[in-house]
Structure formats: structure tokens, C-alpha cells
């Protein structure tokens, strides 16, 4: 999908530097100082327009959230949503997920959210999928010995691929739903895509896996 250029985006992000962190690598290993507390940190890779992360932050004030979004034209919308929500436990980073271990120390992150990631359906693009083994390794590098991935998608092919990828990587599947909205999901915060697909009657697939790297070190 082609993103519309927003020439004002740089100025907007600079004006909201308390939310959109411009040089996140400087905080590697000390994100607690950014939030002013030692609460656990959860990240969302591919934060999009920010509905999920701002909702989660409001629902869980004792957890710190960091959203990762590659596209500047999208993250500006997320910044505005965080501002409108009034949540103070959210920061947003305009970076590539490939650079996670440049930004976070091992063990600094407790949970990774992957919501409606691009399925990259062509085989030649497999390495771009956020549940491909090289990305799982990056999540491992920032979570350390324990951690979790919470994964949602409307794409059955990506879901099946991801379950296989998780299993081959040695992760433990703790929850799985083939139709999330018909299984009474407690505390579920919907993304913009989730609202759209759910309204069309499409099932939403969800999985939780535990990161038990100590079993493989």
C-alpha cells in the first residue's frame, strides 16, 4: 500500500517529541528513565494509526507501551491518537523493526504485539513477514529469557504460517482462537483493521506464545 506523503510530518513529530522519540537508541537499556518508573514494557511492532496502543495504555496504566511504526505518514496519526487519549504511558518510534536490538537491551521488553501485519503472501517475500524466524530472533534479543508474543490477523494463510514458525522456533503456544470475536475475548482492544474486518463478518485469528529462551540457550 502506497503511503501519502505528509510534508508537515517532520515538524509535527518534532513538536511532539515527548511522545515520538526522535533518537531512541540513546535510551537503550534505560527506557525506565523515559517513563519515570520501572513498570514492564510492551511493544507493538507495526503500530499503524495507534488505536490499539492508545487503548491498551488507557486500560493498563501500570504497563508502559512503545509503538514501532516504519511509515512517518502513519505514525503522525498515532501520535495524535495518543495525545487525544490522555495516556502518559506510551511512546512511539519511527523506526524499522530490523533495528529493535539497537534500541532495546536484552530483557528490557516483556511482550511483543503483532497486529494485522502485512502477510507478504508471495514466497519470495517470506523474509519480510514479522513472524519469520529472523524477526523472532530479534524479539528474542530484546526479551531475553522470558516473554510473550500476542498475534492477531484476519489472514488465515499468515496465521497458519505463523503457528508453524512459532513451533519451529521452539515457542510454546498458550492460547489460540480461530474466531476471536465469537470467543468472548476479555479486554480485547480492536485495531482499525480489526473493526473493519470484523464488521464484514471475517473471523479474526489470534495466538499467544510464550518466549522460553532459557530452554534453548
Curated annotation (Swiss-Prot):
Its EC number is 2.1.1.33. Residues 124-129 are annotated as: Interaction with RNA. It catalyses: guanosine(46) in tRNA + S-adenosyl-L-methionine = N(7)-methylguanosine(46) in tRNA + S-adenosyl-L-homocysteine. S-adenosyl-L-methionine binds at residues 44, 69, 96, 118. The active site is at residue 118. One of its GO terms (molecular function) is tRNA (guanine(46)-N7)-methyltransferase activity. Substrate binds at residues 122, 154, 191-194. The keyword tRNA processing applies. Pathway: tRNA modification; N(7)-methylguanine-tRNA biosynthesis. CDD domains: AdoMet_MTases. Keywords: Methyltransferase, S-adenosyl-L-methionine, Transferase, tRNA processing. GO terms for cellular component: tRNA methyltransferase complex. Catalyzes the formation of N(7)-methylguanine at position 46 (m7G46) in tRNA. This is tRNA (guanine-N(7)-)-methyltransferase. It comes from Bacillus velezensis (strain DSM 23117 / BGSC 10A6 / LMG 26770 / FZB42). The lineage of its organism: Bacteria, Bacillati, Bacillota, Bacilli, Bacillales. The gene is trmB.
Amino acid at each position: 500500500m502506497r503511503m501519502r506523503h505528509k510534508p508537515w510530518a517532520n515538524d509535527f513529530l518534532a513538536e511532539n517529541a515527548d511522545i515520538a522519540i526522535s533518537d531512541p537508541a540513546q535510551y537503550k537499556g534505560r527506557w525506565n528513565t523515559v517513563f519515570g518508573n520501572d513498570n514492564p514494557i510492551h511493544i507493538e511492532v507495526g503500530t499503524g494509526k495507534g488505536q490499539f496502543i492508545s487503548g491498551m495504555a488507557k486500560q493498563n496504566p501500570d504497563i508502559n507501551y512503545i509503538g514501532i511504526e516504519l511509515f512517518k505518514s502513519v505514525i503522525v496519526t498515532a501520535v495524535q491518537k495518543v495525545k487525544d487519549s490522555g495516556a502518559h504511558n506510551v511512546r512511539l518510534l519511527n523506526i524499522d523493526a530490523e533495528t529493535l536490538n539497537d534500541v532495546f537491551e536484552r530483557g528490557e521488553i516483556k511482550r511483543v504485539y503483532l497486529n494485522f501485519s502485512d502477510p507478504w503472501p508471495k514466497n519470495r517475500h517470506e523474509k519480510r513477514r514479522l513472524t519469520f524466524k529472523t524477526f523472532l530472533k530479534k524479539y528474542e534479543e530484546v526479551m531475553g529469557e522470558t516473554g510473550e508474543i500476542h498475534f492477531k490477523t484476519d489472514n488465515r494463510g499468515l496465521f497458519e504460517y505463523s503457528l508453524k514458525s512459532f513451533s519451529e522456533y521452539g515457542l510454546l503456544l498458550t492460547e489460540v482462537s480461530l474466531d476471536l470475536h465469537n470467543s468472548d475475548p476479555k479486554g480485547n482492544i480492536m485495531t482499525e483493521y480489526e473493526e473493519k474486518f470484523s464488521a464484514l463478518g471475517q473471523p479474526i485469528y489470534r495466538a499467544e506464545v510464550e518466549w522460553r529462551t532459557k530452554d534453548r540457550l
